[in-house]
Amino acid sequence: ALTLGAGQAQAATTWKIQSVWDAGTVGYDLFEEWCNSIKEKSGGELIFRPYPAKAVAADNNALFDAVRNGVLQGMNPFTLYWSGKIPASVFLSSYPAGPDQPHQWDTMFYSLGMLEKTREIYKKYGLFYVGPIQHDANIIHSKKPVNSLADLKGMKIRVPGGMVAEVFQQFGVSTVSLPGSDIFPALEKGTIDAADYVGPAVNYELGFSQVTDYILFGPPGVMSIYQPVDLMDLTVNLRAWNALDPKLQQLVEEEVRNYSQKHYLTIQKRNIEAMEKFKADGDTVTRLSQQDLQEFRRAAIPIWYNWANKNEDAKAIFDMQLEYMMNDTVGYVTEEDLKAAGK
C-alpha cells in the first residue's frame, strides 16, 4: 500500500464520512477501524472522521444530499440505495441472474472501464465514486422447502422491490416489501412464507433460525441467484475530491481496494461460522439447480432490458456487462438467449 511520509508541515484535511452501518455492528467496526488508519497512512495529511448511520444525516435521502452539499465529505452506502436518484445504479451492484461472483464485479470495474464510466455518471450529481466495496450475497429464509423454481409458485416472499420483485413475480411469487425490522415478526406470525435479507451472519443474529426452517441457495458456488454481490462503495463530494492532492487521491483509491477485500473476507468468515449455527438449530439448506438458474436468467433478460432502457447511463453500464456475460470466459448469456427474449 502507498504510505505517504510527513513531508512539508501543512494543515491536515479532515473528511466527515457517514456509513449506513449502525454503531456496534461488525460492518461499522470495520469501517471505523479503516477510517482511523488513514491519518497514519497519509503521514498526517488526511483524516477520515467516521460516523454511523443517522449520526449526521437522518436517512438515505438526507445522506445523499449531505454529501452533494458538502455537509459531509463522504458516504459509505449500499450502491443500490440510489436506484431512484441515479438510474444506472441498478447495474452498479448485482441484479437477478447477472454477474454473480465478486471477482467478476472487480474485473468489470477495474479492468473493463466500468469505474471510469461510473465516475462520469456520478460527476453529473456533484459526486465522485471512489470505488466499490465488496460485501456479501443476500439470501432467502423460508418456512417451506424450495427445491426448484416450481416450488416458488403461490409463495408470499419479502424481497426488495424493483428488478428483483419483477423477476420473482414471473414464477408466481406474491412479493411483499417490508423494512428489515418487520421481517422477523412477519415470519413469526406467518403473514409471509419466506424473506430475503442480507447474508447468513447478520440474518442469524436477527433470529431467523427461530422462525424459518429452510435457507434457499443457488447451485454450488452461488449463494444467491437474485442478489449475489451486494456492493457498497465510497462516494465523496466532487469538490472535496478535486481539492485533494493527487498523491492523496491515489492513496484513497488504493485504500478503498484494500478495505473492500478486508470487509468482504471478514463477512465471509462470519458467514461460515453462522451457517454452522443455522445447522445446529435444525435449519436445512435447499439448492436450486444450474437448470433453475438458467431458467431464472431467461426470465430476467427482458427485465434487464426494461431497466437499462429507462436511462442512457444505465444502458451504457448494462451494455458493458452484457458484453462481458456473453464473452466465453463467462458464458452466462448466448445469442440464443437474447433471441428467445426477443432482443
Q: What kind of feature is each model-predicted range?
A:
Residues 104-117:
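Signature of the catalytic double-stranded beta-helix
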Residues 10-104, 120-343:
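N-terminal secretory/targeting leader peptides
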Residues 2-9:
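C-terminal segment of classical bacterial N-terminal signal peptides
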